[in-house]
Amino acid sequence: MGYEKFTWVIKNFSSLQSEYIKSDIFVIGGCKWCLLAYPNGKQNASYLSLYLDGPTLKTLPCGCRRRIRFRLTVVNQLSENLSRRGEGKRWFDKKLPLCGYEEVLLLTKLNAKHGGFLVNNEVKIVAEVDVLEVIGKLDVSKESQEVIKPRKRMRLYGDGGAVSSHLHKETSSVDVNGFQVLPSQAESVKRIFERHPYMALEFRAKNQQLRASCINVLLSLIKTLCQSLQDISIDDLGQTEQVLTFLQNSGFKVDWLERKLEEVKEKKIQEHIGKSRMQGLEEDLKVFKKKCSDIEALLEKEKEELKGLKQKCSDIEALLEKEKGKVLAAAARTPLTFDDIL
């Protein structure tokens, strides 16, 4: 059967007041499911908790069980490589109707301003479920499920602001230059071959799955190079070089992509050098500002001492003038006569 996907967008995440919120119920493999999220953690308030729940299992007779594979992903909307995913395989039954992760993502990372998990105050969660075995009756018959699948279902929770998008799974493919690609990829692949028509002339693989995998690798590489310099590391670029080598060894002529990679690498290196210089200059500025502050403080102290010395000079000058007046007064007195002395 393979995985089927359900996307849940939680709106107004930072203002949620409820202890937990639930998505709409969705149907995969004839079984009803929903997602359960604790915005402030179930046990640890530092983490987002996320669970997959089988809401009807509690009401089904004992012995009813579903064995599934599942993936729960908190999507990084800036870089898919940074998304946080957990996956597992297990039985769901009346006693164990839900499974998930108590600490799926640290809230400081989720709430980071440019972290990519919280965009426009929205958190995007994707559940992928593959029902492997069902013991007991289905919640929804296959016929009913076929009717339900194409319909979009969207509902706002009045107090939580959670929006559940429709169930979807891309199973069809489109041929572009001999490569089977998903409809969502067709336009991008078509543009690549329009700009570089001889890119795959030496690519000899006949297996369509292998051919599709190589195209996926190519698209992922281009997507990586389209990220902002802030979102891509030098290590990422090193891995990108390895991917490029893989494509070249597979027969793809991607010298144009190699040039772009070198351009991005050069810009990233310049950014790294610039940041190092900035850090050094910031440290120098900090030191010189401290010296200026110390000298200014010393100058203020010297000013106070100078002010005191000037005051002392003024006091001494006044005292000198006073003594000088006494001396002049004494000198101007009429001399005593002989008779005055006798």
From Swiss-Prot:
Record SUPFAM superfamilies: TRAF domain-like
Pfam families in alphabetical order: MATH_2 (PF22486)
SMART domains, per database record: MATH
Keywords: Coiled coil
Signal peptide: none
Any coiled-coil regions, as ranges: 253-327
Segments forming domain MATH: 3-129
Protein name: MATH domain and coiled-coil domain-containing protein At3g44800
Organism name: Arabidopsis thaliana
